[in-house]
Amino acid sequence: MSFAEKITGLLARPNQQDPVGPEQPWYLKYGSRLLGIVAAFFAILFGLWNVISILTLNVGCLVAGIIQMVAGFVVMLLEAPCCFVCIEKVNDIADKVDSKPMYFRAGLYCAMAVPPIFMCFGLASLFGSGLIFATGVIYGMMALGKKASAEDMRAAAQQSYAGNATPQTTNDRAGIVNNAQPFSFTGAVGTDSNV
């Protein structure tokens, strides 16, 4: 068993089916899950640090810390439901979110990560929520899908040039607008008070 198979076996859920959509590379699929778990852990940890800021009577950081901790718990619930075995419906919720398109999860993670950063800007909220935001960005990239092959892109480029009937110009002044007037420096405006 190779190292990659061991890692994918550790990060796979029990009874997990392959996604119906386009196949993602294994390192992106399981890397996003691993980043989500690490992001959730640090979001909870640094959210707790922001909650302790109530000692300095900073209510904005208290609320931001609570939101960041809730976001961390939600990400942990969706990425690693095995951490919440004491709650009955966790697997149902995780399966329901897994059945949604990837851009749903990307938008959810990015939307949950932004408010704590704006409410209490600091290293704790920036790092904790920033990792959740990075997880959302990776899920967004996975939602966009793979890039087309080089042959497909060449064929599409040739078709777009074939439809363009205008001749290509190589003149140095080809980008200049016709009948454009040069700038003129006429001096001071008539309403200038010379101050």
From Swiss-Prot:
Topology in membrane: Multi-pass membrane protein
An example Gene Ontology biological process: photoreceptor cell differentiation
Major location category of this protein: membrane
**Spans traversing the lipid bilayer:** 34-54, 66-88, 117-137
GO CC annotations on file: cell projection; endosome; presynaptic membrane; synaptic vesicle membrane
| Site annotation Calcium ion selectivity: residues | E79
Does this UniProt record's set of keywords contain Transport?
yes
> Per its record, what are the GO molecular function terms?
calcium channel activity
Family to which the UniProt record says this protein belongs: Belongs to the calcium channel flower family.
Designated name of the protein: Calcium channel flower
Write down the species: Drosophila ananassae (Fruit fly)
What gene is it encoded by? flower
